[in-house]
């Protein structure tokens, strides 16, 4: 059995919000654009064909003005349970699992890299772990904003 821990970045987060709202935040481009990317970044979504085989193309705009194009293909979507996408350049597979918990929702977000060397480059050199943590924080803040503004009804 292969040890994936040297090639995997895993984050778990709990939200005080219903699963359907968290799912919408991941599946609706009008919501994704409000939280995707590390702190200080903005996002332009060029295409988000949220279906298995669909493309997700976006540009992250860094705080210094640098643009970072991103391309992914959705590999598996199980409504309200699971999203898997393949990201290119750098290559990794992302799996996001959604689960209702008492009083909220838990997500588990895994990124699987091709090799320990690629993991080291992306996670250690480019701080992907910190970026993923900031993405979660931005999502937490966005969800809270939607709830506070009454923009989501169960």
Question: Which sequence ranges carry the predicted segments?
Answer:
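Hydrophobic ligand-binding cavity/cleft-lining segments
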Residues: 1-42, 47
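A short, structured loop/turn motif at beta-sheet edges
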Residues: 19-20, 50-51, 75-80, 97-106
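Hydrophobic pocket/interface hotspot
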Residues: 22, 32, 56-58, 74, ...
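Intrinsic-disorder/low-complexity, polar/charged segments enriched in Ser/Thr/Lys/Arg/Asp/Glu/Gln
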Residues: 6-12, 19, 43, 55, ...
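Beta-strand/loop substructures that line and gate deep hydrophobic ligand-binding cavities in soluble
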Residues: 86-134
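Short, highly charged C-terminal tails/helix-capping segments
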Residues: 142-154
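Glycine-rich portal/gate segments that line the openings of hydrophobic small-molecule binding cavities
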Residues: 43-85
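Generic structural detector for well-ordered beta-strands
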Residues: 10-16, 49, 59, 73, ...
